[in-house]
Amino acid sequence: MSRLLESEQESESGSENLVSSGSIALSKHEEQKRELGVENRLEQYSRRLSQLALVDTNESSDSSEKEEVFVQGSLRSQQSLKASIQSSSHGHTGAPQKVMIKFQSIGSITSITPSVCQISTNKPFSVIISFLQRKLKMENIHCYINNSFAPVPSQNVGDLWNQFKVNDELIVSYCGSVAFG
């Protein structure tokens, strides 16, 4: 019976060793997972920093060269994006270069002839105001779009036309005194 007890004790101690070695193996595996997780997070963090062009000066020269190449590539992509935005804003997307403006008088102010004129889309609305001042030989002229609101003089005529055109014409009403509240 002593042999049986000794073998049981050996098997129990062996199983404890297996369990302890298994837990060591599991803990090593968990540590590796944690290290990989930390490494992955650090890599993601460094990628984000390089996208923001915040490069750490303490890194090795190889990684800094790679980041500089990445930053240069991102700058090129930003420049191409700006160029495409500028080309689309200059009317290369099919929008007309000049738009039709229809003038309507309000009240006792004289009407101008012709009542329809063309203007470039990139001009500010102040150009229309100065045109009316010259044409009517008046200093104070109040302009309204579609008889509803007075645009800011710095507003782009092309933007106003895109948003408020009626039958491909921007209707500009004008008068010598304030017409609407």
From Swiss-Prot:
What Gene Ontology cellular component terms go with this record? Answer: Atg12-Atg5-Atg16 complex; autophagosome membrane; cytosol; phagophore assembly site membrane
Per the record, the GO terms for biological process are: autophagosome assembly; autophagosome maturation; autophagy of mitochondrion; cytoplasm to vacuole targeting by the Cvt pathway; glycophagy; piecemeal microautophagy of the nucleus
> Could you cite one Gene Ontology molecular function of this protein?
protein tag activity
List all membrane-crossing ranges.
none
The entry's keywords? Autophagy, Isopeptide bond, Membrane, Protein transport, Transport, Ubl conjugation pathway
User: Major location, coarse class?
Assistant: membrane
Q: Crosslink site(s) for Glycyl lysine isopeptide (Gly-Lys) (interchain with K-144 in ATG5)?
A: 181
UniProt membrane topology term: Peripheral membrane protein
This protein's source sits in the domain of life called Eukaryota
Which subcellular locations apply to this protein?
Preautophagosomal structure membrane
Q: How does it assemble?
A: Forms a conjugate with ATG5.
PANTHER family of this UniProt entry? AUTOPHAGY PROTEIN 12 (PTHR13385), UBIQUITIN-LIKE PROTEIN ATG12 (PTHR13385:SF0)
What function is annotated for this protein?
Ubiquitin-like protein involved in cytoplasm to vacuole transport (Cvt), autophagy vesicles formation, mitophagy, and nucleophagy. Conjugation with ATG5 through a ubiquitin-like conjugating system involving also ATG7 as an E1-like activating enzyme and ATG10 as an E2-like conjugating enzyme, is essential for its function. The ATG12-ATG5 conjugate functions as an E3-like enzyme which is required for lipidation of ATG8 and ATG8 association to the vesicle membranes.
Name assigned to this protein: Ubiquitin-like protein ATG12
Q: Which organism is it from?
A: Candida glabrata (strain ATCC 2001 / BCRC 20586 / JCM 3761 / NBRC 0622 / NRRL Y-65 / CBS 138)
Instruction: Tell me the organism's taxonomic lineage.
Output: Eukaryota, Fungi, Dikarya, Ascomycota, Saccharomycotina
